[in-house]
């Protein structure tokens, strides 16, 4: 159970490169932020890392990396309240940017990795060009589920629309 507000369970934070090689960053992460907002279309986050072993150089970070972890509040057992970004059961986040890279002293590098959900990355790379006929909620579901478009595997929560429309996106 939680002793203090803000307590959390985080067993590991793996940075996985394009070859599938993973490095546990749990002990070199200074700060982790996760952002979710009704005003944004995806979950994003950042982690600040103190790197004394040149892990970023050894992994050959090139923009195809993923970050895998499971984050929960102590005492939480409901899967819906767990942020599962693991390789086995969830959907790892994708690294899209490295910022604030600083050489603090000889052998110690500090930098920030920015990451986002798989859907965020697919949305950046995918253009929808199609006509839809019917309820708009069905068109949105099709775009989100279709393998050619967003291809989300997440459970969707939506409200049915009452009218039928023709729309070209």
What does each model-found stretch correspond to?
Residues 55-168:
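Surface-exposed cap/loop segments at beta↔alpha junctions
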Residues 1-78, 111-122, 138:
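Juxtamembrane "anchor/assembly" segments of surface/extracellular structural proteins
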